[in-house]
Amino acid sequence: MIPRIMSTQHPDNYSIPFFASSPILEGEDEITEAFYAFSVLGADEQMWDFEGKEVDEFVVKKLLERYPTFFKNNILGKDIRLTPRVPNPSVEKEEAKLLLETLQGIARSADYARIFYGDNIAPIFEVILPMTTSVEEIERVYWLYKKAVVWISREKIYDITVREWIGDFFPEKINVIPLFETKSALIKAAKITEAYILNRKNDIEYQRVFFARSDPAMNYGLITAVTYVKRALYEVLKVEEELSIPIYPIIGVGGPPLRGGMRPDNVDAVVKEYPSVQTFTIQSSFKYDYPTKDVVKAVEKIKSTKRKLPIPVEIPPFLVNYEAEYQKQIRILAPYINSVAKRIPRRRKRKLHIGLFGYSRNVNGITLPRAITFTAALYSIGIPPELLALNSLTDSQLETISEYYINVYEDLEFAMRFFSPKVAEKVGLKELAERVKEFKPEQIPEYIEEAEIVFKGEGDVMKLAQLRGFLG
C-alpha cells in the first residue's frame, strides 16, 4: 500500500506541540512526534529529514523499543513507512558524507527490525533525494547504497569477509525518490523519471516522484509554481502509460496558498486541485495549529479519497511577464523580508550553513530566508506573497489560469484578507494595491492594523500567525 499521508518536519507551526520539551523541536521530541503522527493522527508515512537538520539516526531502534505494542500491530516498513530525506552531494557539498552515513543507517535499522519482528523486514527502503536535476543524481544514490553498503559485505578484511565478521546488509537495494524543486527540474521531471525507470525496469514494481510546491512558488510566484507542478504531474502520467510501471506522485504542501493550501479545513480543495497525487504531506502547522479531532478527521478524509486523472496543462506564454513582475517586486521587498525574518521564531533545530539566515535561499542573486520564514515575513507586514505580480495579470488571463488552477480565485481571496494597501503603497507597490482593490476583498481589520505596526518595526508577529492560522 502506497502511503496517502506523509507527516513531515517542516517548521510552519505557531503552536508548541503538547509533548515538546522546548519551542524548538529536536531529538527526542521528534521521536515522539513520529509516533504521534502514526498512532494518533493516522499518517501512514513519516519523513525523517537529514537535509540540513539534526535528527536522530537511531529513530527506528527508539521507536521499536519505546512503543513495542503499536509497532507489533503496525509493521514499520510494511503497514507504515519511515522515509529519510538525504542531502544531495551535487548541491550540498558540506553535507555530502552524511548521505553515506544515512545509507549505512538503513542496514543498521534493518538489523533492529529483524530482532524486533523475528523476520527480515526493512523498516526503511526508500530515500528522498532533494534538488534532483538529472537521472545521474538518482542513479548515484542507488548505486552508492549497493556498492558502499551491500556489496562491501563481500570484501575480505585481513583474514575474514565483512559478511562473516559483521553480518549481511539488508535490504539488498533501495528505492530513490527524486524531489523536483526548480522550474527547470519540473520541466525535465518526466524525462528524468522515464530514464530512471528504463534503467531500473527489471528491478522496480513502481516509482515514486516528489514535487515541491514551496520553493517554486517562492522563486517564481504562486501561479508559475502551480502551473509547472501540474504540468509535471500530467507529463509523468504519460510516462506511466508508456512504460506500464505505476508512478505515484508526492506533493509537498503547507498551510498558506503559496505553499499549497494544505490546512485541515481545506483538504477537499487541495485533493481536488491535485487529483493524481498519491501522497500529500501534512506539515507542522497542519498537525499542531488546529484541534486534534479536526486534524484526524481531515487525515481520514484524504485517506478515503481515490486518485483521479491529472488536469491537462499547457504553459501560458503570459507567465513570462508574470515572473518578471514577481522578481521585480521581490527585489523591492527583500530588505523588508530580511528585516522581519529575524523576528520569526525558530521551530526546528537546523544545522548552520554559511549565509545570512543559516540555511537560506538565493533567488536571482538576492539572499532570502527559506520558504516558511519568507512567507511568514511577508504575511507579517500585510503583503501575502500569493498576491505578488497579480497586477501583471488581466481578468482574461486569470480566467485562462482558472481552467487548470481550480482554486485560484479562492486562494487569492484567502490571501487578500490579510493584505494592507497602505503598506503596499509605502514600499512602492501601488499598482499591486490598486489591482487587489478591484477584487473588493473581505479583509480582517484587526490583522491589517497589527501588520502595519509590524511593518514599522514593532507589533506582534505571533499574534498575526494565530489570526491567520499558520506561521509561514
Swiss-Prot record:
Catalysed reaction, written as an equation: oxaloacetate + phosphate = phosphoenolpyruvate + hydrogencarbonate
Enzyme Commission number: 4.1.1.31
InterPro entries: PEP_COase_arc-type, Pyrv/PenolPyrv_kinase-like_dom
Pfam families: PEPcase_2
Entry keyword set: Carbon dioxide fixation, Lyase, Magnesium
Database matches in NCBIfam families: PEPCase_arch
Protein's job: Catalyzes the irreversible beta-carboxylation of phosphoenolpyruvate (PEP) to form oxaloacetate (OAA), a four-carbon dicarboxylic acid source for the tricarboxylic acid cycle.
Sequence similarity: Belongs to the PEPCase type 2 family.
Subunit structure: Homotetramer.
Name of protein: Phosphoenolpyruvate carboxylase
Organism this protein belongs to: Pyrococcus furiosus (strain ATCC 43587 / DSM 3638 / JCM 8422 / Vc1)
